[in-house]
Amino acid sequence: DLAPALGRLPDGFDPDAPLLAEMRADPVLGDRILIAEPWDIGPGGYQLGRFGPPWLEWNDRYRDDMRRFWRGDAGTIGAFATRLAGSSDLFEGVTRSVNFLAAHDGFTLADCTAYADKHNLANGEDNRDGHGENFSWNNGVEGVSDDLAVIAARRRDIKALLSTLFCSRGTIMLTAGDEFGRSQMGNNNAYAQDNGISWIEWDARDREIEAHAFALGQWRRSCVELTDVALLGEGDVVWLDEGGQPLTVAQWEDPARRRLVLHFRASGLSLCIN
């Protein structure tokens, strides 16, 4: 959490700052999995992609780009593909991306599909706290709904988001409860809520979403194409359109494009997004 503080020197952040260098060289810490939340509120606090090996880094660009794609924002197909393939614009050689769609701060995954706006009045700050831009949507009704069509649409969107996460190159981070549709009733800053807003209601699990997440996990464990951390190049994959032809520049630049296929040349595995 707030990892840039570990490498902040008088002239700014340095990935080779003494503390970070000592951690890499330490006989105990050096071979551990090191994970950075690469931003804080200090000067020069946003350092995504700069920690270097062996650090893994929370990738909020992944979160935002994937939410925007599934929200239906125009012109997002290129960013979607970049995140799906490991975020080569942020990392070199191997992906060190920790891919996530929701975290302890912000909306839960289910709330991303049920609330277009934050609802933080219970926090006592007149809804001023919490991020204002969540790249979320509500499927036509803000908040809780008993409309079966709305419920089905939200469940479909949650499944699509989970499927995207489990099909992405990099390390998966899934917040507790997101695998079965946990809601915070639109509260995106619930750290101080020790009540039903933040609690996990085990008896209220959406078993359909839970089964979908379980199946995705089982499948991913056997899929070396996704667990390999090497960044993908043209020799490894080809991006196809819905007709099975390589995407053209014009297709990549089409703001309305919503479909693509990621085809792995060696194994023949194809991931279809539509």
Describe the function of each predicted region.
Residues D241-N274:
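Carbohydrate-binding surface patches
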Residues A204-G233, G244-P246:
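Aromatic- and carboxylate-lined catalytic core of secreted/periplasmic carbohydrate-active enzymes
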Residues A3, W39, D203:
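Anionic group-transfer/hydrolysis microenvironments
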Residues D1-G7:
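Short acidic catalytic loops
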Residues L9, D14-A176, F180, N189-Q193, ...:
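Conserved alpha/beta catalytic core and glycan-binding cleft of carbohydrate-active enzymes
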Residues G7-D11, L148-A153, D203-R207, V249-W252:
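Short, contiguous acidic/charged loop-to-helix segments that flank catalytic cores in large enzymes
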Residues R182-F214, Q218:
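Extended hydrophobic/aromatic segments used for targeting, binding, or gating
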